[in-house]
């Protein structure tokens, strides 16, 4: 059963992670489980929405994009806080595998320069944060080896490189390196040599041997056999690079391995195929991590049950003692009554003797009269507390009962018997109380067991709950709304501004632009239909509300519209247009002092109920449910929480809300 991805797997993972390039890091979380640690980086990709990148070290070592919900700590650990401090809104510009090893570097671009996050997926695993000069800022784990140290302020050194990189097999020198390695290591099994030359695990080394039809244990290969192995290696890696069939391999209905291609070793075993290797890796490890979390929860519940069972054991021991003591006290009282006259005579004799002589004399007389029918009953005298201990017996139901009975010489036989009965009564009252406590403890244990089973099922269900990634329509990549039946889209940044104008603006569309630096283009998709004045006024409000003016707290600004043919990417002579910027030539149709008025609500559009923003008049006319917003410094997370509660009946999640809100902060002004 696989617990960590191989360097072959890493190659496939890194290839598929390239879709994250140009994404920006939003938050970093660190989850500590009993056996492993997961670093989760929430990355927002311009045209792909938010994704969660998981780097896991410990027992389970892997990297993937996850679709599974995880319970994140409310207070992030220091390593996660450090990444948030340095990499907040940093652009992910490069992801690379180092030397076909289990080492991946994530390059982030910030205003202060380039930073790197290195994931090492061998040994116990590690995650190391570097500056642009490869100096370690902080590792998740401090480690020391003979060849390198992973400690702050030291230069990061990569693990030793393997002789041959699978990416370079097409070069003629690759075969020479491969052949020389075999010829220089005669006497070693070929499967071991393949593993060493490429730095790959036994699974893929054996696959190469099997494809070359050469016994994996064979030594001293001929050049022809070496050539066969090399060709089989090329064939295998070509399949890994270009013709994957991502899959989870099952054994006895349990997840056993996750691999990117069909392997001869797993021929005949059940397989579950996927569209991407990342998805397969995500599903595979989510299964095992759930078991770890559930096992941890189970351990907590079992400890509490064990604690209650210890309480129950002590209660039962106490109950047993109370019952035994109550019975003994009852018997002693009964024995006094059964021997009432003897006891009374004895007590009187002791009291009378005490008036005439000291205790030493009395004890001597008793010792000298061991055969006396009454004095002979006395076993001991505790003169300090006025107690004598006698042995009494009586026949009850043909059974002789005999006990040592303590008597208070200051009391008569009746009073001594009543004293024992009173003790028995008090103990019986305690028995009733302890029996009630025992029932409550038993009930608590049963409730814990039942609750534990339910909580474990709930925990398992929650841990295994896979987030359904909504299939977003093309326009949901941007800010968008629907005004009087017209679809309106707006850019969110320089990248989406450029995409909208170049890819999604047709010749009959109308393009708005707020008269403030950095404002997004807002496009009315007319589909050749005439747009009335009311619609233009509403779109004008939408365009200014999604500009920087909202963040700056302006009440109104100018905006204008133009036709697509007036927009050009050709700068004036001697000028340069940066990304997202265009030149507008010709007449501009202005809407002066357009108020920033915006709300958020749900609308039925394109066969679904969606959340988006719109000016008040449009909200009232077309939206199912809505609220008005105003610029504010209120924490965005709190606003999202409030809006999620308002629209809870429509299946709206946090990401849906965050995608549509205007730039900067806001708060609800009217529900």
Swiss-Prot record:
Keyword annotations from UniProtKB, A to Z: Coiled coil, Protein biosynthesis, RNA-binding, tRNA-binding
Protein name in UniProt: Archaeal Rqc2 homolog aRqcH
Coiled-coil zones: 291-363, 410-465
Organism: Methanocaldococcus jannaschii (strain ATCC 43067 / DSM 2661 / JAL-1 / JCM 10045 / NBRC 100440)
Family (UniProt): Belongs to the NEMF family.
Pfam families reported for this sequence: NFACT-R_1, NFACT_N
InterPro entries given in the database record: NFACT_RNA-bd, Ribosomal_uS13-like_H2TH, RQC_Subunit_NEMF, RqcH_archaeal
Record has tRNA-binding as a keyword: yes
UniProt GO molecular function: ribosomal large subunit binding; rRNA binding; tRNA binding
Gene Ontology cellular-component annotations: RQC complex
Purpose: Probably part of the ribosome quality control system (RQC). May mediate the addition of alanine residues (Ala tailing) to incompletely synthesized nascent chains from stalled ribosomes, leading to their degradation.
Ranges that cross the membrane: none
The keyword RNA-binding appears for this protein: yes
PANTHER family: NUCLEAR EXPORT MEDIATOR FACTOR NEMF, RIBOSOME QUALITY CONTROL COMPLEX SUBUNIT NEMF
Subunit (UniProt): Associates with stalled 50S ribosomal subunits.
């Amino acid at each position: 059963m696989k617990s960590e991805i191989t360097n072959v797997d890493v190659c496939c993972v890194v290839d598929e992670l390239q879709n994250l390039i140009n994404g920006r890091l939003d938050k970093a979380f660190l989850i500590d489980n009993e056996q492993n640690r997961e670093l989760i980086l929430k990355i927002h990709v311009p045209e792909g929405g938010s994704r969660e990148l998981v780097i896991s070290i410990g027992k389970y070592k892997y990297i993937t994009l996850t679709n599974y919900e995880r319970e994140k700590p409310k207070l992030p650990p220091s390593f996660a806080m450090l990444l948030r401090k340095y990499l907040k809104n940093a652009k992910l510009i490069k992801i690379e595998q180092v030397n076909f090893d289990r080492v991946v570097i994530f390059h982030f671009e910030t205003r202060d320069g380039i930073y790197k996050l290195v994931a090492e997926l061998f040994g116990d695993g590690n995650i190391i944060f570097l500056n642009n000069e490869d100096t370690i800022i902080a590792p998740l784990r401090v480690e020391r080896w003979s060849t390198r140290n992973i400690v702050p302020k030291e230069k990061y050194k990569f693990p030793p490189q393997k002789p041959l990189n699978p990416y370079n097999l097409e070069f003629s020198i690759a075969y020479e390196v491969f052949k020389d390695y075999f010829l220089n290591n005669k006497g070693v099994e070929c499967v071991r040599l393949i593993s060493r030359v490429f730095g790959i695990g036994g699974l893929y080394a054996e696959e190469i041997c099997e494809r070359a039809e050469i016994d994996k244990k064979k030594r001293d290969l001929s050049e022809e056999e070496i050539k066969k192995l090399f060709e089989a290696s090329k064939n295998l890696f070509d399949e890994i690079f270009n013709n994957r069939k991502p899959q989870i391999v099952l054994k006895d209905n349990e997840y056993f391995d996750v691999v990117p291609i069909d392997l001869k070793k797993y021929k005949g075993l059940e397989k579950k195929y996927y569209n991407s290797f990342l998805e397969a890796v995500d599903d595979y490890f989510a299964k095992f991590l759930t078991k770890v979390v559930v096992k941890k929860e189970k351990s907590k519940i079992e400890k509490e049950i064990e604690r209650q069972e210890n309480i129950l054991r002590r209660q039962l021991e106490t109950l047993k003692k109370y019952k035994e003591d109550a019975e003994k006290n009852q018997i002693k009282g009964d024995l006094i009554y059964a021997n009432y006259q003897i006891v009374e005579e004895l007590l009187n004799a002791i009291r009378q003797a005490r008036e005439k002589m000291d205790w030493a004399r009395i004890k001597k007389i008793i010792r000298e009269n061991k055969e006396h029918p009454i004095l002979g009953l006395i076993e001991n005298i505790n003169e300090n507390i006025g107690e004598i201990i006698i042995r009494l017996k009586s026949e009850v139901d043909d059974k002789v009962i005999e006990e040592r009975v303590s008597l208070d010489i200051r009391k008569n036989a009746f009073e001594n018997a009543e004293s024992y009965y009173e003790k028995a009564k008090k103990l019986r009252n305690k028995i009733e109380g302890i029996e009630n406590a025992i029932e409550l403890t038993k009930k608590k244990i049963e409730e814990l067991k039942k609750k534990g089973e339910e909580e474990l099922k709930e925990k398992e269900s929650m841990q295994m709950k896979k987030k359904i990634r909504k299939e977003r329509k093309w326009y949901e990549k941007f800010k968008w709304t629907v005004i009087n039946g017209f679809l309106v889209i707006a850019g969110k940044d320089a990248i989406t501004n450029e995409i909208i104008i170049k890819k999604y603006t047709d010749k009959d569309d109308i393009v708005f632009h707020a008269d403030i630096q950095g404002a997004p283009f807002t496009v009315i998709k007319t589909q050749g239909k005439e747009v009335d004045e009311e619609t233009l006024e509403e779109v004008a409000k939408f365009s200014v509300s999604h500009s920087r003016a909202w963040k700056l707290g302006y009440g109104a600004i100018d905006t204008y519209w133009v036709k697509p043919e007036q927009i050009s990417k050709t700068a004036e002579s001697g000028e340069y247009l940066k990304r997202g910027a265009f030149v507008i030539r010709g007449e501009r149709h202005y809407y002066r002092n357009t108020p920033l008025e915006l709300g958020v609500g749900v609308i039925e559009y394109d066969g679904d109920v969606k959340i988006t923003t719109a000016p008040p008049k449009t909200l009232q006319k077309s939206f199912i449910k809505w609220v008005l917003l105003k610029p504010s410094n209120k924490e965005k997370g709190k606003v999202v929480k409030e809006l999620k509660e308002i629209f809870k009946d429509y299946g709206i999640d946090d990401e849906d809300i965050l995608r549509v809100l205007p730039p900067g902060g806001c708060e609800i002004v009217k529900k």
